[in-house]
Amino acid sequence: MKVGILFSGGKDSALAAILLSPFAQIELATVSFGIVPNDAASVARVLGFPHVIIGLEAALATATVDAMIEDGYPNRGINHLHKTALERAAARYQIVADGTRRDDKAPLLNVREARSLEDRSAIDYVRPLLGYGRRAIDALADAHLEVAYGECISFDYEVELRRVMESSYGSEAVEAVFPQEHIQSRVTGRKSVVF
């Protein structure tokens, strides 16, 4: 059984891969507009999983940024983009997973949206971290991963959307739309765990 996991290079998607790996063949899939350099493949190698990049059109980035500017907040745009990323992954895999967790606001599909994705695409959509809160995720990451933290250091589409927004609307728009001090994670290694 092969599972395609949407992969940003951060701890959530890495933990999703580790949790599913005893039960499935894992392939990490990074969705990218090709706007900024993407080295998620090196993080995938550190984790020991194969990696692919799924390309998205620049027009989608522009439309997503325009929606964020209209809303003054990123959630609707991020959720729309995440749904598109899942649909693109569904064209490649029978089982699609991501690293969304219980406390996420965006990206996050509700149950109706998840069922719709599965029905329309004839796939299974798996969210192995959905029952975990932030403290549990942090504890798992601390036990199994070496992680760096900072702003815009992962390879998720938010980094590219920030760049498009800055180019089109200026840095003030980025500061107004995106939460201040949004800390991201980037996996730098995998710890050996002995039970």
What is the predicted function of each stretch?
Residues 1-4, 9-195:
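Nucleotide-activated chemistry modules centered on ATP-dependent adenylation/adenylyltransferase
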